[in-house]
Structure formats: C-alpha cells, structure tokens
A protein has these predicted regions:
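Acidic, glycine-rich A-domain
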Residues: 318-443
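Alpha-helical structural motif
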Residues: 31, 57, 250, 264, ...
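An amphipathic, basic-hydrophobic helix/alpha-beta surface used to engage anionic
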Residues: 48-49, 57-339, 382-386, 400
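Generic hydrophobic, helix-prone segments enriched in Leu/Val/Ile
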Residues: 12, 16-19, 271, 312, ...
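Extracellular/lumenal glycan-associated context and N-glycosylation machinery
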Residues: 1-77
Length: 443
C-alpha cells in the first residue's frame, strides 16, 4: 500500500511540474475556468456552461497545437558565484547563444534544479514535524509528509526570467535571481527556453542540459564575539604545527649536538668555529586554541532544531577572532571529525563549507562526541558547545570539561516548549527556534 501511494504521489508531482512549466499564468487561469465550466455544465439547464467550456477548450487545444514545434538551436552558459547563503537572495549570470539565423523574441528562461522528489525509503522512514498531531487519514496516507519532504529537498526558488530579443547568431547575457532555501549543494540540471504561443496560454519548450552545482552556506546571525576565559596551551604538534600557525619557537641558546637532533637546527657558523656540531635550542610553543562542539545527534530528517544549531555554529565560527588563535570545529558524522581554522592553518570560510554539508548522526551514541572532545582537551584553551538537548549524556560532557579545568560555554537550541521543560543551570544559555537572533544578541 505504501509503495502504491508513493508511486501515485510521485506521478502526480511529475504531472504537476510539467503542467506548471507548459502553462503560462493565463493558461493556468484558462484551465481553472475549464474546470469550473465542467462543474457548471453538470446542470443541463444551464447552456452557458457548455458554451464557456467549448470556447475555452478550443483555445487551449489551439494553443497546445501551436506549441508542439519549437525550431531553434541554442547554447547556454551559467556563471555562478563561489558560494551562496541560505535565505539570502542573490543573482548570477546566464549567457544564451542563438545559433539560428532568425531573431528570437519573446522567450523566457527557466533554470531547472534536480528532481526534489524523495526516495521511497525517505518517504517511509521520515516523519514530518508535528505529524503526530494530524488526523488519522493524513497520517496513514502520508500526503502532508510527501509535500513536506518535497519542500525540504527543493533547494531554491528561481523565478522565470524573460529574455531580451536574441539576435541571429548572437549571444545575450542576463542576470537571474535566486533565493536558496537550504544549506548544502544546490544542483542544477539544465536550462529551458520557453516560448509562449500567440494566445499566451501554452509554452513551447527547448531544454538544454547544463549540470552544475553551487554550495550554499548555512544561515548566519549577527552576534558579538564570544569571550572565553582561558590560557595559552602547549601544542603537541611540535615545530611543524608551530610553523604552520605562525608561531616560531623562541630561540634560547646554543648547545652541543645530541643524537636525534634535526639537521636544520645545526648552527653552522659555530660548528665551523669550534669544530664540533652545535645546535640551536628553542622553547616549546604555546598558543590559544578553542573548540566549537556541534551536537549532530538527532533522528529527524530536516529537523529545524538541528538546522538552527548548524546556523548557530556558523555564526559563532565567523564571530571568533582566529588571527591570533586556532578554532577546532568538532562533530560526529560517519566518524568523529575535527576541522581546524586560524593562524594560517585554514580560513573560517572553510569551516562554513564544512558546516554547509554536515548531516545528522543517527547510528552512533552521544558518547562518540564525548570521547572526541576529551581526547583533545589538553590542547584546548576553551570550549563552546552547541547542543540539541540537556539529557544525562550531554550534562556529563559539560561536567567532565569543567572538572578538567576547560572554560566552557554551553548553548542549548530547541523549541520553546521543550526548553521550558528543561531545568537548565544558570550558566547554560537557551536559544529558542524562531528567536535565535535575539538569543545570540544576549550573549
């Protein structure tokens, strides 16, 4: 039964998509009038319904027939920026080349994304937020869940772009507006040139395959830098890490060579003067290193709380000054990850790229993140934890960090009703979904 419903929903969505592309606004209105005329025509005493139905049907058939043939040869080139940001409108350029010897006018550019329909496994296993509050029929049939999944997988809104007249064997470049709806890779499938028929009801289409992708960064909120008490810590990466982050070791003195000393530390002038190997001695390197810990442990697909937590982590990452310190982004996906930025190791922008693609972890316990953080606590000057709850496992992580003397800031992201039920300590900051910006402004 579930598979039959899935096939019906999928076929209906495909039909609706093709109909929306084929019909102009006037064409959609004509179809609506056609349907209304059918309903009115059920009363055989009202001949006006038959007359309207016949007239509109004839117009639609003529328009559809005239749009069957679209002779034209075109090429397209899409010029995308490096990044976009979720929820922020932006523009990009598309170049259209007319390879025919006729001037083409009245065309409309439709830029197409990949198919947003979910797979059967996603349809069966996913749960729409608040689905338990729907009526029995909606829960069993699942169409609201289908519509929600399609909206979650639809990457952006791209309105049709009317084109200026295309000269024969010429090229025209236009700007297209797009509003990314979610973070992650936005995948384009191709572009379609639509030509309305003389009645303006139905469009003839000419599709051009043009696969491309654009990385959409998470939504960010304005906020001040989070101040974390902490001291410079010894970094066990040695000379290689110290030179990478820009802190060369401090020269102390010269001493006789010992077995195992690297050749690059030999002081050649002293070697030539005294006749035996002499090396330069340095102090160990210390600098500030903070951790940004992101809780990815949620079972829901497209969980808005998780998406807001990712946005909070992105906002914190860009607010922290990494010119004089390191920032480790830590989370658990298929495995435990730690990405470092600052002091020449990497730019904060690269952390945003990572956050654009991070997904929820459903097959590992929270303790996996606990161990990953504690394995690096010796090198940490401070820690910021962005959590999705306040259960025993998460409280244990915070207590363990505080017991080890690591200054820790804790941010809990959740819905208001969920946060109200939690007994949060005074040092734990709550961030309500829908009021994230206000919560971050209070930090």
């Amino acid at each position: 039964m579930k598979r039959l419903l899935y096939r019906w929903f999928s076929s209906f969505s495909a039909f609706q998509y093709r109909l929306d592309r084929r019909c102009t606004r006037a064409g959609s209105l004509a179809l609506g009038i056609l349907g209304a005329a059918v309903v009115i025509g059920l009363d055989t005493n009202r001949t006006v319904g038959y007359q309207v139905f016949t007239l509109v049907l004839a117009l639609v058939i003529l328009s559809a027939a005239s749009s069957l043939v679209f002779r034209g040869r075109f090429a397209a080139r899409r010029i995308l920026p490096r990044f976009a940001s979720a929820g922020v409108p932006m523009t990009y350029r598309v170049a259209i080349a007319n390879h025919t010897r006729r001037r083409q006018a009245g065309l409309v550019l439709l830029d197409e994304l990949t198919d947003p329909r979910p797979s059967f496994e996603e349809f069966v296993t996913a749960r729409e937020p608040g689905e338990e509050r729907r009526n029995w029929f909606d829960r069993q049939v699942g169409y609201p869940r289908w519509a929600w999944l399609v909206s979650q997988k639809r990457g952006a809104v791209i309105p049709p772009r009317p084109l200026p007249p295309l000269d024969a064997v010429g090229e025209t470049e236009v700007t297209v507006e797009i509003t990314p709806l979610r973070r992650g890779h936005l995948r384009f499938r191709g572009v379609t040139l639509a030509r309305p028929d003389p009645l303006g009801l139905v469009q003839a289409l000419k599709s051009i395959a043009l696969p491309q992708s654009l990385l959409v960064l998470p939504k960010r909120y304005p906020m001040a830098e989070i101040r974390i008490a902490g001291t410079r810590k010894y970094q066990p990466g040695g000379v290689a890490l110290a030179s990478t982050v820009g802190d060369s070791e401090e020269f102390v003195s010269l001493r006789d060579y010992r077995a195992g000393d690297p050749m690059r530390r030999i002081h050649w002038k002293s070697f030539a003067r005294v006749g035996r190997p002499v090396v330069k001695e340095y102090l160990d390197e210390f600098f500030v290193r903070h951790a940004l810990v992101l809780d990815t442990f949620t079972s829901q697909v497209g969980d808005p709380v998780f998406e807001e937590a990712v946005s909070v982590a992105a906002s914190i990452a860009i607010s922290m000054q990494t010119q004089e310190s390191l920032l480790d982004l830590m989370f658990v996906g298929p495995e435990a990850y730690c990405f470092t930025a600052g002091r020449g190791v990497a730019h904060t922008e690269q952390l945003l790229e990572v956050l654009a693609c991070v997904g929820p972890c459903r097959d590992k316990p929270f303790r996996a993140l606990h161990h990953a953080v504690l394995d690096r606590h010796d090198a940490l000057s401070g820690c910021v934890c962005v959590l999705l709850g306040w259960d025993d496992a998460r409280q244990e992580l915070v207590r363990h960090l505080e017991a080890l003397g690591t200054p820790t800031r804790v941010l809990i992201v959740g819905r208001r009703e969920t946060l109200d039920r939690l007994a949060l300590p005074g040092h734990v900051h709550r961030l309500e979904v829908g009021r994230i910006a206000e919560g971050l402004a209070c930090l």
